[in-house]
């Protein structure tokens, strides 16, 4: 019987299955950070258990770390406790830890691929919803809760039920100024935040194949905002080339063995999907979110929706609530929305290609005087690469702050946050109420669109700044 990519990875990791569909899956890779792991390690300690396979877990501090001068340590007491606790837990249980001052430190979903820890055909879990990012490598990757983190540490397995197969085909070529961030925002706008519920999404089509590894990571990263359990893209030569020579990638004959398996990781012709939709790349435009859900998208040349045009009373009330929280009036042009801050970074758009995209727009230009703008590289290695290319100088010359790596203003768990009423053009993944700080207002955009907004002081069309 023809199988999907998801079917193949699932079957290869099945330890046991009950009659009701409950299954036990082997977990190849476990990523850990400081926020969702303390109780898990404490549970092991209280039960007198060890980490079953310490070499299959990699830990890093990313959520709470400061992005300003780290020589002063962590000012917030609670954040310091979480980071210190992760370090001591990793020492006690023999887990590799990339500390705050390790140049390899960064956002968990960026450092995994950088180190070659992320590999095709593996099951990867992390106590973090954006674990789907690693699906860009043809891995089955998804977020888990703290009790599940403990279960994986103790057993290297996880109890799951198989999801449905959902394929999204995107064919064609993207117009100038349109990026993979716009593609995933368009998809979420189309299917809604519940559109992928109970499914694993495989992204396919000529556009997906043409994307770089990092662009694919952006798409898989936001799969969770479309309600799905995980997002997958079949691995190809771009993925193999990316992983070759990485510190934790297979070496010598192990590389040859791995390649043999990796090359088999594709959906068979004739495999059945429970749901399938098609998009045309040429129809996608630069996107922004206007409201308080990732499905609240409009094109940059569009208008904020008007609740009066909505027949459904619940949807009408929801629109009114979002408009009220966001401080927007119905029918406002997207380009008339004034912003206060710009944030370029996160596990969605904090990689080197994202920084290049923004720097290209900002070169020889200045940000608007009223805008506070920051770039937070996704890892120490991204920061180092950007500095070698002189991107930091472009950002600083245009008036941006050049920061240390971490999650930063994506979720405002460190000092980087919006004040009540402040409006931000952000390259992150969530625009919920209070996500970037209590009362903060978030508009999700691509790195190029964030740069354009910084220059004009309003949400703006990146195509104006491109040849």
Swiss-Prot record:
Q: Which InterPro entries match?
A: 3-IsopropMal_deHydase_lsu, Acnase/IPM_dHydase_lsu_aba_1/3, Acoase/IPM_deHydtase_lsu_aba, Aconitase_4Fe-4S_BS, Aconitase_4Fe-4S_dom, IPM_dehydratase_rel_enz, IPMI_cat
Question: What is this enzyme's catalytic activity, as reactions?
Answer: (2R,3S)-3-isopropylmalate = (2S)-2-isopropylmalate
Q: In which pathway does it act?
A: Amino-acid biosynthesis; L-leucine biosynthesis; L-leucine from 3-methyl-2-oxobutanoate: step 2/4
Which one GO biological process term can you cite for this protein?
Answer: L-leucine biosynthetic process
Report the coiled-coil segments. Answer: none
Report the GO molecular function annotations: 3-isopropylmalate dehydratase activity; 4 iron, 4 sulfur cluster binding; metal ion binding
Task: Give the keywords, sorted.
Answer: 4Fe-4S, Amino-acid biosynthesis, Branched-chain amino acid biosynthesis, Iron, Iron-sulfur, Leucine biosynthesis, Lyase, Metal-binding
Q: Could you say which cofactors this protein requires?
A: [4Fe-4S] cluster
Q: Which Pfam families match?
A: Aconitase
Task: Specify which residues bind [4Fe-4S] cluster according to the UniProt entry for this protein.
Answer: 347, 407, 410
Q: Which residue spans traverse the membrane?
A: none
Disulfide bond positions: none
Q: How is the cofactor bound?
A: Binds 1 [4Fe-4S] cluster per subunit.
Q: What is its EC number?
A: 4.2.1.33
Role summary: Catalyzes the isomerization between 2-isopropylmalate and 3-isopropylmalate, via the formation of 2-isopropylmaleate.
Similarity field: Belongs to the aconitase/IPM isomerase family. LeuC type 1 subfamily.
Family annotation (PANTHER family): 3-ISOPROPYLMALATE DEHYDRATASE (PTHR43822:SF9), HOMOACONITASE, MITOCHONDRIAL-RELATED (PTHR43822)
Subunit info? Heterodimer of LeuC and LeuD.
Q: What is this protein called?
A: 3-isopropylmalate dehydratase large subunit
User: Which species is listed as the source?
Assistant: Pelagibacter ubique (strain HTCC1062)
């Amino acid at each position: 019987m023809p199988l999907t990519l998801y079917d193949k990875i699932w079957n290869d990791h099945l330890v046991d299955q009950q009659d009701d569909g409950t299954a036990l899956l082997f977990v190849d890779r476990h990523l850990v950070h400081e926020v969702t792991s303390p109780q898990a390690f404490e549970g092991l300690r209280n039960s007198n258990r060890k980490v079953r396979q310490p070499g299959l877990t990699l830990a890093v501090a990313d959520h709470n770390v400061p992005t300003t001068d780290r020589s002063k340590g962590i000012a917030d007491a609670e954040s310091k406790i979480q980071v210190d606790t992760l370090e001591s837990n990793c020492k006690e249980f023999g887990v590799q830890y990339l500390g705050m001052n390790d140049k390899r430190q960064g956002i968990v979903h960026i450092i995994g691929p950088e180190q070659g820890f992320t590999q095709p055909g593996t099951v990867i879990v992390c106590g973090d919803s954006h674990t789907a990012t690693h699906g860009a490598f043809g891995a089955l990757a998804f977020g888990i809760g703290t009790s599940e983190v403990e279960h994986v540490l103790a057993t290297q397995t996880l109890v799951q039920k198989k999801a449905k197969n959902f394929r999204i085909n995107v064919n064609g070529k993207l117009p100038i100024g349109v990026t993979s961030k716009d593609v995933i925002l368009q998809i979420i706008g189309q299917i809604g935040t519940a559109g992928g519920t109970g499914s694993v999404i495989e992204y396919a089509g000529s556009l997906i194949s043409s994307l770089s590894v990092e662009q694919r990571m952006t798409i898989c990263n936001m799969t969770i905002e479309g309600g799905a359990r995980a997002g997958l893209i079949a691995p190809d030569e771009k993925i193999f080339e990316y992983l070759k020579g990485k510190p934790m990638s297979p070496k010598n004959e192990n590389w040859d063995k791995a390649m043999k398996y990796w090359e088999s990781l594709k959906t068979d012709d004739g495999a059945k999907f429970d749901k399938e939709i098609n998009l045309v790349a040429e129809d996608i435009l630069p996107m922004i979110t206007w409201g308080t859900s990732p499905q609240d998208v409009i094109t940059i040349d569009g208008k904020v929706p008007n609740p009066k045009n909505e027949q459904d009373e619940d949807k009408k009330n929801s629109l009114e609530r979002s408009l009220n929280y966001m401080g927007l009036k119905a029918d406002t042009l997207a380009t008339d929305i004034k912003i206060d801050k710009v944030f370029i970074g996160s596990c969605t758009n904090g990689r080197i290609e994202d920084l290049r995209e923004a720097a290209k727009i900002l070169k020889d230009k200045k940000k608007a005087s009223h805008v506070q703008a920051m770039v937070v590289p996704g890892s120490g290695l991204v920061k180092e690469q950007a500095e070698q290319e002189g991107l930091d100088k472009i950002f600083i010359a245009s008036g941006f702050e050049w920061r240390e790596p971490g999650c930063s203003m994506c979720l405002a768990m460190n000092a980087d946050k919006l004040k009540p009423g402040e409006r931000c053009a952000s390259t992150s993944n969530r625009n919920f109420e209070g996500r970037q700080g209590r009362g903060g207002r978030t508009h999700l955009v691509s790195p190029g669109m964030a740069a354009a907004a910084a220059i004009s002081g309003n949400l703006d069309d990146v195509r104006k700044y491109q040849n």
